Amino acid sequence: MIGSRHAFDLNGPTACEVIQPTDRDRIAARLGQDPLRRDADPEIAWERVRRSRTAIGTLLLNQSVIAGVGNVFRADLLYSLRIHPERPGRSLERTQFDQLWQTLQRMLRIGVKYNRIVTADPAEVGKSPGRMRREERLLVYKKQACRECGQIIASWKLGGRTIYACQRCQS
């Protein structure tokens, strides 16, 4: 929808409704840190992750921990860092979390810039993100085999969604 002052991209939301400013503030208060915002504080997200026994793959989908992470980014982010999705959040080292945050920022910014999810490194593919085919843009999500070791990609339910991972490369 495009109006004289505003535009809305309704591609993807499962629900859309007009709300009052007080409702917006209440909803926003429940959200975790958004890696795309300049004022995001990764320290707040780190505190939530480091204290949790919950699997990092589940924590990443919890919008009150880190806002904006969906299923594709979750799978490919963890694959890119070689972190198993079932690993408890509290088992991550601070350096791993910092790397996770920075990688997530990079992936999300590329997605915004090109209006599509791109988690693979365009330099490795040899194409700009805008020219990459869907199967070239993703690392592990809905893949058959691991691009590194060739092992069959495992998939199972985690946090209510299907996760994809290489059981050999992600530990």
What are these regions (language model features)?
Residues 1-171:
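Structured catalytic/nucleic-acid-binding cores of DNA maintenance enzymes
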